[in-house]
Curated annotation (Swiss-Prot):
Domain remark in the UniProt entry: The presence of a 'disulfide through disulfide knot' structurally defines this protein as a knottin.
This protein's name: Cycloviolacin-O22
Homology family: Belongs to the cyclotide family. Moebius subfamily.
Function of the molecule: Probably participates in a plant defense mechanism.
Post-translational modification comment from the UniProt entry: This is a cyclic peptide.
Cross-link (Cyclopeptide (Gly-Asn)): 1-29
Domain of life from the UniProt record: Eukaryota
A Pfam family of this chain: Cyclotide
InterPro entries assigned to the protein according to its UniProt record, in alphabetical order: Cyclotide, Cyclotide_moebius_CS, Cyclotide_sf
Amino acid sequence: GLPICGETCVGGTCNTPGCTCSWPVCTRN
């Protein structure tokens, strides 16, 4: 889906549901 979640994951985790960490940003399908 949207490639960018508007969240960063420099610490390695994403808080947004459905998002995964593709350092240093969160992405989703």
